[in-house]
Amino acid sequence: VKDNIIAVQSSIDNPIKALYETKKIAVEVLGKKEKSPQYQLQKYYPAIYAEIRKKELSAFGETFKMSLKKGMKSGIFRPSLDTQFITLIYFNGFRGLRDIELFPPEDYDIDQIIDKFIDYHLRAIVTAKGLKFLENYNTLKLNEN
């Protein structure tokens, strides 16, 4: 999973598009409802789940920061972002989406809530140029469905 995410982040020039492509990998790994490995770990093996959560940030944090810096350099993200802070906020928020007590799988589709979260996150950090790209990208996604 880590290698796939790093490959996506490295191969796609636009960090907004790369984040949505990374989301596809996350949804595939998280799976749907009770069958997802994340759900099983959180429910039946909470100690193992807690340990995995600790390792996530170290595994993906640097790649995420590089993507933020790429977006800042290209004018898609605001130039004054604190990349460490944004990384921590993003990962904490993403973890919250996977909390089965906050978002019970029988009530929430993981694909939809991750899309909403990414949109929420991006709107907080994009420039006018980035917002235009985001809105166009979202329109294209709607037209594909």
Model-identified regions with their sequence ranges:
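Hydrophobic alpha-helical connector segments
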Residues: 3-36, 87-90
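C-terminal peripheral helix-coil segments that are non-catalytic and often amphipathic
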Residues: 66-74, 104-145
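Alpha-helical elements of Rossmann-like donor-binding domains used by nucleotide-donor carbohydrate transfer enzymes
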Residues: 21, 25, 51, 63-66, ...
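Short, flexible helix-adjacent loops and helix caps
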Residues: 6-10, 35-41, 73-76, 99-106, ...
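Short secondary-structure transition hinges
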Residues: 27-65, 69-81, 85
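All-alpha amphipathic helical-bundle segments outside canonical DNA-binding/catalytic cores
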Residues: 16-17, 55-56, 73-89, 107-112, ...
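Hydrophobic recognition helices of helix-based DNA-binding modules
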Residues: 1, 5, 26, 30, ...
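Short linear capping/connector segments at secondary-structure termini
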Residues: 5-6, 38-47, 136-140
